[in-house]
Amino acid sequence: MLIEQAYLHGKPESSGLLRSQISDFQVFEELPFLPCGEGEHLFVHIRKTGANTLFVARELAKYFEVKEQLVSYAGLKDRFAVTEQWFGIHVPGKQEYNLDDLNIEGVEVLSYKRHNKKLRTGALTGNRFELILREVTAIKAFTERWQKIVEQGVPNYFGEQRFGIGGGNIERALSLFSGQKVKDKKKRGMYLSAARSHIFNSVLNERIQQQCFDKVAVGDVLMLAGTQSVFHLDEVDSAIQQRFTDKDVDITAPMWGAGELMTSNAPQVLEQEVATKNLEFCEGLPRFGLKQERRRIRLTVSDTDIELLSAEEDSAQEESNAVKISFFLPAGCYATTVLRELLNYQDMTTRIDKRETAVNSNQQDSA
């Protein structure tokens, strides 16, 4: 049930391969603070390669001999990648730890230190990405499009991973709204998030289709850069236009829940039309305690760099048409959202997933 997602800059000319090898996708988590050195929580900074965040959390719980609920992290990170992130373990007392004997497959401990507060979900500034794309075609078009993205941003769509394989989490959300019980709290949360994301993506897609993605209008709700603070736009003047151009404010779309839409005039009409087409979601979400919130529709990439790799630099192949790009994204935003606007990419981990599924299936059949 995934919707078609309109491109802001038209369909990309270039194509290429993503994650031909795990080291082609690197993520570096950035927290807004560093551990202070004392407190009940031990913060462990790790580099993981080809390892799932939940798997690492479970292994840390075993190592520290605590319940899994006492291990926290700011956000989930890709499995098929090299990622650096923090974990927090609740270990009251003054015991000093030496983690030299911590042995988790694919995990390297970078540092660890105590802190006086729990590491909570979402408590990160954002992530820096360093990606290598291989077999890139139409290099000139690729570099020109990258420059457009740097200057103008991309639609802040929720990535496909938000919706599960084939958009299955959206279907499960519909089952939830029709009365099916889901006891697992995390799964229920995933389905509700998928439903909200579906509405948001639908509104965003409609704004692009109606050519008002980058046009502020009376009745819009704008969000201040670097914050979640929003305000209703009563008047459009040259000052607000300039603030939008300077990326000081952004247009928003609804994260659906109980309460009235914050928009008015034409923006509210557009949002209400999308809601009418998705009544099951819009009537179901408030029943689970979710309230109306807003999310910016423009994703701005920052701290960007692009490098065309020579054959000497790209050890994976003799003749290189590989490109390395790096950029920073705020928390809750997806690198794949940037990539889909940049090129038609094939994620090579899809093949890995299929091979692993086949192997696991064969093992179960023979058990």
UniProtKB/Swiss-Prot annotation:
Keywords: Isomerase, tRNA processing
GO MF term set: RNA binding; tRNA pseudouridine(13) synthase activity
Pfam families: TruD (PF01142)
Cystine pairs: none
PANTHER family: TRNA PSEUDOURIDINE SYNTHASE D
Catalytic activity, reaction form: uridine(13) in tRNA = pseudouridine(13) in tRNA
Domain (TRUD): residue spans on this chain: 153-300
UniProt similarity note: Belongs to the pseudouridine synthase TruD family.
Keyword Nucleotidyltransferase tagged: no
Biological process, per Gene Ontology: tRNA pseudouridine synthesis
Catalytic residues as annotated in Swiss-Prot or TrEMBL: 78
Top-level taxonomy: Bacteria, Pseudomonadati, Pseudomonadota, Gammaproteobacteria, Alteromonadales
Any one of the GO CC terms: cytosol
Protein name per its UniProtKB record: tRNA pseudouridine synthase D
InterPro entries referenced in this protein's UniProt entry, alphabetically: PsdUridine_synth_cat_dom_sf, PsdUridine_synth_TruD, PsdUridine_synth_TruD_CS, PsdUridine_synth_TruD_insert, TruD_catalytic, TruD_insert_sf, TruD_pseudoU_synthase
Species whose genome carries this gene: Colwellia psychrerythraea (strain 34H / ATCC BAA-681)
Entry's EC annotation: 5.4.99.27
Role this protein plays: Responsible for synthesis of pseudouridine from uracil-13 in transfer RNAs.
